[in-house]
Amino acid sequence: MTLERSDVEKIAHLASLGLNEDDLPQTTAALNSILGLVDQMQAVNTDGIEPLAHPLEASQRLRADVVTESNNREAYQSIAPAVENGLYLVPKVID
């Protein structure tokens, strides 16, 4: 899969990225290079290979899952400017 200049412009627009005209050729080449690497990895035969969760066979000593702090929800919400049904109300940011 290769991307054209128009594809990169559309992706940049959808991601709200501001790309200069001078940056488009370099960005297109970089994205095509990444996609080429992904294509190479997808071409590798992985039949019979068990998925790997972690490269090292090590286990971690974990602490006990115990509640260590008290519930201060009401105290925190009592000083909030706007709360409804236990949720903080905030101004709308995105139109």
Swiss-Prot record:
Nucleotide-binding keyword on record: yes
Pfam families, alphabetized: GatC
Keywords: ATP-binding, Ligase, Nucleotide-binding, Protein biosynthesis
Catalytic activity: L-glutamyl-tRNA(Gln) + L-glutamine + ATP + H2O = L-glutaminyl-tRNA(Gln) + L-glutamate + ADP + phosphate + H(+); L-aspartyl-tRNA(Asn) + L-glutamine + ATP + H2O = L-asparaginyl-tRNA(Asn) + L-glutamate + ADP + phosphate + 2 H(+)
One Gene Ontology term of the molecular function aspect: glutaminyl-tRNA synthase (glutamine-hydrolyzing) activity
EC annotation from Swiss-Prot or TrEMBL: 6.3.5.-
GO BP: any one term: glutaminyl-tRNAGln biosynthesis via transamidation
Top-rank taxon: Bacteria
InterPro entries referenced in this protein's UniProt entry, alphabetically: Asp/Glu-ADT_sf_sub_c, GatC
Broad enzyme group: ligase
Subunit structure: Heterotrimer of A, B and C subunits.
Chain's role: Allows the formation of correctly charged Asn-tRNA(Asn) or Gln-tRNA(Gln) through the transamidation of misacylated Asp-tRNA(Asn) or Glu-tRNA(Gln) in organisms which lack either or both of asparaginyl-tRNA or glutaminyl-tRNA synthetases. The reaction takes place in the presence of glutamine and ATP through an activated phospho-Asp-tRNA(Asn) or phospho-Glu-tRNA(Gln).
Protein family per UniProt: Belongs to the GatC family.
The protein, known as: Aspartyl/glutamyl-tRNA(Asn/Gln) amidotransferase subunit C
Species assigned in the record: Pseudomonas fluorescens (strain SBW25)
